[in-house]
From Swiss-Prot:
The lineage of its organism: Bacteria, Bacillati, Actinomycetota, Actinomycetes, Micrococcales. This is Translation initiation factor IF-1. InterPro entries: NA-bd_OB-fold, RNA-binding_domain_S1_IF1, TIF_IF1. One of the essential components for the initiation of protein synthesis. Stabilizes the binding of IF-2 and IF-3 on the 30S subunit to which N-formylmethionyl-tRNA(fMet) subsequently binds. Helps modulate mRNA selection, yielding the 30S pre-initiation complex (PIC). Upon addition of the 50S ribosomal subunit IF-1, IF-2 and IF-3 are released leaving the mature 70S translation initiation complex. Keywords: Cytoplasm, Initiation factor, Protein biosynthesis, RNA-binding, rRNA-binding. It comes from Tropheryma whipplei (strain Twist). The keyword Transcription does not apply.
Amino acid sequence: MAKKDGVIELEGSVLEALPNATFRVELSNGHKVLAHISGRMRQHYIRILPEDRVVVELSPYDLARGRIVYRYK
């Protein structure tokens, strides 16, 4: 899969699960963002629970929202 230009990838940990597959994630730099699960993670039924370490993609246009693209094992 090709890397997207302009996205920011950061590590974080899931604080809480919210409705509609949305999560509150605390990034490694201390910021808290709202993040939803990427389509491929939904497709493969990857479950995300609080305290999981994840990788979040942020758009440079809105740094308060992101997309969870990977869950560490």
